[in-house]
């Protein structure tokens, strides 16, 4: 099965370098028309320049593809709306959104300024919200859309000194879970990708030998599958160095602790059993937790 994007229009945010650049090049190489969005700022989000986005556009055009540059900040709702309109005015539609833009403001939580916490949330989470909100009505109208959230192992599992980044990245998974349910009837499929790649964002975070093995282009195949015609939905893929894994948010079978006054003590005594991963499940939606608990309660109380 060949994956191609002929006739499709994609927006890739944070595409002026690193992973976003590789995403834009990968989509264009397989026929997509690409809006290369990049604020052109520093790793911490400061500054602005269209040079990086224009450079990627030049690469795509030199290879025979179609692309336009856009310098909107994903934190600016009006600018994001204008970016989507730019795609519509140029090519008549928007089929794919890759939410990739991000910054880092790493410090331990004790030392972190709340402004730095909020800014990381604004760029990663609200930036994705803005872009997704702007493309959503177009995707609903055309009964087709593919949206990718860039999550992270930090969001899924935690990382020292990245409480702001981790909070934003796990929030994107929750955002994905609900949008996938809401978009299903419109053939809008929403997924998440947790990349491990050597980029400007990861400089200084890992040893050089490790970074050398984690070239950003190795993540692109996972991205292409997650925004393809036959993409899954509500899927989290982790990718790096040529390896791909799937991550799931699971729930154990749990255990009955009852309603008596000693329920806290029972839970403390049974905590290992409650946390036992044998037979754990991936709930199809948020209501499944309540349904599971009601079924157990009904069985015990009747």
Can you name each region flagged by the protein language model?
Residues 60, 108-109, 116-121:
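Substrate-binding pocket helix/loop in short-chain dehydrogenase/reductase
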Residues 152:
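Residue(s) in the substrate-gating loop at a strand-loop-helix junction
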Residues 50-54, 71-82, 114:
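The beta1-alpha1 cofactor-binding region of Rossmann-like NAD(H)/NADP(H)-dependent oxidoreductases
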Residues 3-36:
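Canonical Rossmann dinucleotide-binding motif of NAD(H)/NADP(H)-dependent dehydrogenases/reductases
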Residues 132, 168:
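Active-site helix of classical SDR
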Residues 192, 210-301:
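C-terminal helical subdomain
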Residues 6, 63-66, 86-99, 105-108, ...:
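A glycine-rich helix->loop->beta "capping" turn
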């Amino acid at each position: 099965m060949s994956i191609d994007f002929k006739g499709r229009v994609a927006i890739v945010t944070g595409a002026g370098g690193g992973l976003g650049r590789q995403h834009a090049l990968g989509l264009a190489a397989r026929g997509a028309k690409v809006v290369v969005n990049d604020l052109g700022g520093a790793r911490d989000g400061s500054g602005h320049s269209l040079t990086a986005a224009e450079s990627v556009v030049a690469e795509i055009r030199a290879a025979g593809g179609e692309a336009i540059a856009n310098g909107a900040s994903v934190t600016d709702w009006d600018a994001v709306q204008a970016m989507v309109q730019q795609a519509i005015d140029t090519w008549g539609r928007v089929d794919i959104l890759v939410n990739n833009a991000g910054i880092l403001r790493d410090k331990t939580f004790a030392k972190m300024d709340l402004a730095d916490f909020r800014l990381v949330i604004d760029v990663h989470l609200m930036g994705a919200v803005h872009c997704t909100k702007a493309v959503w009505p177009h995707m609903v109208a055309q009964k087709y859309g593919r949206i990718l959230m860039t999550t992270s192992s930090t969001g899924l599992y935690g990382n020292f000194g990245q409480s702001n980044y981790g909070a934003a990245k796990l929030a994107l998974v929750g955002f994905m879970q609900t949008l996938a349910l809401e978009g299903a009837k419109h053939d809008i499929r929403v997924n998440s990708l947790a990349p491990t790649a050597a980029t400007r964002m990861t400089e200084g975070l890992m040893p050089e030998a490790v970074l050398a093995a984690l070239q950003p282009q190795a993540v692109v195949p996972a991205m292409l599958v997650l925004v393809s015609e036959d993409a899954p939905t509500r899927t989290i893929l982790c990718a790096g160095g040529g390896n791909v894994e799937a991550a799931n948010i699971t729930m154990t079978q749990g255990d009955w602790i009852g309603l008596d006054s000693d329920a806290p003590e029972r839970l403390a005594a049974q905590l290992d059993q409650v946390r036992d991963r044998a037979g754990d499940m991936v709930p199809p939606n948020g209501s499944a937790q309540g349904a599971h608990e009601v079924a157990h309660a009904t069985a015990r109380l009747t």
